[in-house]
Amino acid sequence: MDKLRITGGARLHGEVVISGAKNSALPILCASLLTADPVRLSNVPQLNDTRTMLRLLGQMGVKAESAQTSVNLQADQVHSLEAPYELVKTMRASILVLGPLLARFGEARVSLPGGCTIGQRPVDQHIKGLEALGAQITMEHGFVVARAKRLKGASVRTDMVTVTGTENLLMAATLAEGQTILENAAREPEVIDLAELLIKMGARIQGHGTDRIVIDGVERLHGADHTVISDRIEAGTFLCAVGATGGDITLRNTDAAIMGATLDKLTEAGLHIESGPGWIRGVMNGRPKPVGIRTHEYPGFATDMQAQLMALNTIADGTAIVVENIFENRFMHVQELCRLGADIDIDGHTAVVRGVARLSGATVMATDLRASASLVIAGLAAEGDTLIDRIYHLDRGYDRMEIKLRNLGARIERVTGKEDE
C-alpha cells in the first residue's frame, strides 16, 4: 500500500496548475447517459474517482475514449442499467447514475454507495425527489431499484441542502414530462457547471446557482462539448499549504470568483492573496493567525476545506474554534494531527484548536479524502519526517498531489510496498 513521506520545513515557491473539479466531473460524466450522442469533455481530472466512474459507465456499455484530461463519451449502446456494489462501494458519487438511467431508460439498479466514511450521508433525499417525479422505488438486496415509464414534472423540496441530490434530480428532470421546480437546491459552482452542460445538450434550465431551479422537460437531449471548471478545493488546499510553510505560489487554471469564503478565511489567517483571470497568487511570511470557521453550504465555508484550514490553525499564533455543521464524524483527522503535536479538543461538532509553535513529524494514517490533505499540510510544516499511510484516500480526489508539491519545492515522495520499512 502506497504511503507519502514528507520532510517538513521547506517553503513553497513557484506555479502549480489546478486540475478540473472532481465534484463537477463526476456528475458530468454521468450526464453522458442522458443522450445517445457523443459528449466531449475537457479538463477532466485524472483521479481514482474519475477512473472508477469511467469503469462503471463502461460496464453499462458507455464508450469512453480518454487522452490525458480529455474524455469522449457515447452512450448509444447501453446494455446494463445496474451499478454494482464492487464499484459503488469505493465511491458514493456512483448514486449519480440513478437519475440519468431512470430518466432515459425508465429503470435503474444502483447499489447503496460508499466513498468516504463521513457520517451517514443518506440517499433518502434522492429517493424522495425521484418518487415525487413519479418513480417507483424499492430497496432490494442492497440495491436502490427505480422504475418509471416517464418521469413527470413536480415541485420538489428536499429536507436539507444536498449537492448530489440536487444533481441527480436536475439530470432526471431534464427528460421528465412538464415542469420541475427544485426548492432548497444546492447552489455550488459544481451544480452550476452541470447545469451549463445540460443546457448545451438541449435542456431547459433556469435558476441554477440559486436555491430554486426550474427545469422544463424535453423529449431528448443531444451531444455537447464542455470544459469542466477548476477544482476550488484543490486550489484551497495548495493555498493552505503555502500558508503553513510560508512562501510564494501562483495557481493557474483557477477561478477566485468561486472561492470567496475560502479566500476570505485565508486572508484572515495572514495569507496575502492576489488574483486575476485564471490565476491566484498566495504569499505567506511568518506564523498564521488563528481563524474560526463554521462550515455551511455554498456560498458559506466548504466542509471540504475544514480539515485543511484546521491543519493551518494547528500552528497559528492563538486559539481557533472550528464548527462542522454539514457532516457528523468529520473530525477523524484530529487524532492524527495530535500525533504530530497539535493541541485540539473536540466537543460534539466543535473543535478547539490551540496553535503550537511547531509540529513534529510522525507516522500517521489518512482516514478520508480531505483528512489526507490536512495531514499533508501538517507534514509540510512539521519538523522532521512524516509518513502518511492509506493515501489511497488522497488519490481519490487529488491529481498527482505529491508531484505538484515537489515542483513547488516540497520534500515529499511516494513510497510503495516495503520501501518505508
Swiss-Prot record:
UniProt xrefs under PANTHER family: UDP-N-ACETYLGLUCOSAMINE 1-CARBOXYVINYLTRANSFERASE
Provide the catalytic activity annotation.
Answer: phosphoenolpyruvate + UDP-N-acetyl-alpha-D-glucosamine = UDP-N-acetyl-3-O-(1-carboxyvinyl)-alpha-D-glucosamine + phosphate
Q: State a GO cellular component annotated for this protein.
A: cytoplasm
> Which keywords has UniProt assigned to this entry?
Cell cycle, Cell division, Cell shape, Cell wall biogenesis/degradation, Cytoplasm, Peptidoglycan synthesis, Pyruvate, Transferase
Q: Does the keyword Cell cycle apply?
A: yes
Write the Enzyme Commission number(s) for this entry: 2.5.1.7
Q: Which one Pfam family would you cite for this protein?
A: EPSP_synthase
Q: What pathway, per the record?
A: Cell wall biogenesis; peptidoglycan biosynthesis
UniProt-annotated location(s): Cytoplasm
**Alphabetical GO biological process terms:** cell division; cell wall organization; peptidoglycan biosynthetic process; regulation of cell shape; UDP-N-acetylgalactosamine biosynthetic process
Q: What is this protein called?
A: UDP-N-acetylglucosamine 1-carboxyvinyltransferase
Family matches, as SUPFAM superfamilies = EPT/RTPC-like (SSF55205)
Which annotated residues bind UDP-N-acetyl-alpha-D-glucosamine?
92, 121-125, 304, 326
Q: Does the keyword Cell cycle apply?
A: yes
Question: What's a Gene Ontology MF term here?
Answer: UDP-N-acetylglucosamine 1-carboxyvinyltransferase activity
Q: What CDD domains does the record point to?
A: UdpNAET (cd01555)
The UniProt annotation places phosphoenolpyruvate binding at: 22-23
Q: Which family does it belong to?
A: Belongs to the EPSP synthase family. MurA subfamily.
Top enzyme class: transferase
Active site, UniProt feature = 116 (proton donor)
Q: What does this protein do?
A: Cell wall formation. Adds enolpyruvyl to UDP-N-acetylglucosamine.
Residues annotated with 2-(S-cysteinyl)pyruvic acid O-phosphothioketal modification: 116
